[in-house]
């Protein structure tokens, strides 16, 4: 009886550990993917950069993208 209880507890611990590890290994967002709703999900070599959208001087929204760390993007006309 003790062996059955011990085995059950060990199996429960193993399943819990596997589920916790799978939770930590969520798929990350690749470069140029939208991260507005998930700013912490960009892959490790990327950062979630956000930009405001304006029309006639009034802010109309915000866009966020997974971009390379340390890279500066400039608008070209």
Swiss-Prot record:
Tissue note? Expressed by the venom gland.
* Prosegment location in residue numbers: 21-26
Cellular component aspect of the GO annotation = extracellular region
Q: Does the keyword Cell membrane apply?
A: no
Which compartment or compartments is the protein found in?
A: Secreted
Q: Which UniProt keywords apply?
A: Disulfide bond, Secreted, Signal, Toxin
What InterPro entries has UniProt attached to this entry? Spider_toxin_CSTX_knottin (IPR019553)
Q: Name one GO molecular function term.
A: toxin activity
Where is this protein chiefly located?
secreted
Q: How is it modified after translation?
A: Contains 4 disulfide bonds.
Q: Where is the signal peptide?
A: 1-20
Name the protein family.
Belongs to the neurotoxin 19 (CSTX) family. 08 (U8-Lctx) subfamily.
Protein name (Swiss-Prot/TrEMBL): U8-lycotoxin-Ls1u
